[in-house]
Amino acid sequence: MLRARNRMRRSADFETTVKHGMRTVRSDMVVYWWRGSGGGPRVGLIIAKSVGSAVERHRVARRLRHVAGSIVKELHPSDHVVIRALPSSRHVSSARLEQQLRCGLRRAVELAGSDR
């Protein structure tokens, strides 16, 4: 589970990560990654109404928080990650979500390395 200290809460953090971070698109999610200042790795979720009803959105959010909690220990202390769930995310397994998140993060870090 994603711990409270690793959750992104401020809208400014979301905005900075989405605006300045590297974006990778997977079939069920969009992953934004940005290496900012310290403070521990932070992960934020964006679950739009297009994902489904409130029950479906909360189910997707719980699954993504669990998946993010399993990878947060592998992140650099200054990493900021925002996961935007796409409507198809409500139909896939947690294992598939974790695979897509890991692949998206790996690709974002590679892209950031080639830009610098």
From Swiss-Prot:
Per its UniProt record, what SUPFAM superfamilies does this chain match?
Answer: Ribosomal protein S5 domain 2-like (SSF54211)
Molecular functions per Gene Ontology = 3'-tRNA processing endoribonuclease activity; ribonuclease P activity; tRNA binding
Origin superkingdom: Bacteria
Class in the EC hierarchy, top level: hydrolase
Reactions it catalyzes? Endonucleolytic cleavage of RNA, removing 5'-extranucleotides from tRNA precursor
Record GO biological process: tRNA 3'-end processing; tRNA 5'-leader removal
Tell me its EC number(s), please.
3.1.26.5
Question: What keywords appear on the UniProt entry?
Answer: Endonuclease, Hydrolase, Nuclease, RNA-binding, tRNA processing
The cross-references to PROSITE patterns, in alphabetical order and at most eight, read: RIBONUCLEASE_P (PS00648)
| GO CC entries | ribonuclease P complex
Listed Pfam families? Ribonuclease_P
Q: Which Gene3D superfamilies match?
A: 3.30.230.10
InterPro entries cross-referenced by the UniProt entry: Ribosomal_Su5_D2-typ_SF, Ribsml_uS5_D2-typ_fold_subgr, RNase_P, RNase_P_CS
Give the family from UniProt. Belongs to the RnpA family.
State whether it acts alone or in a complex, and with which partners, per the record: Consists of a catalytic RNA component (M1 or rnpB) and a protein subunit.
Q: What the protein does?
A: RNaseP catalyzes the removal of the 5'-leader sequence from pre-tRNA to produce the mature 5'-terminus. It can also cleave other RNA substrates such as 4.5S RNA. The protein component plays an auxiliary but essential role in vivo by binding to the 5'-leader sequence and broadening the substrate specificity of the ribozyme.
Q: What else is known?
A: Was identified as a high-confidence drug target.
Its name, as the record gives it, is Ribonuclease P protein component
The record's gene field reads: rnpA
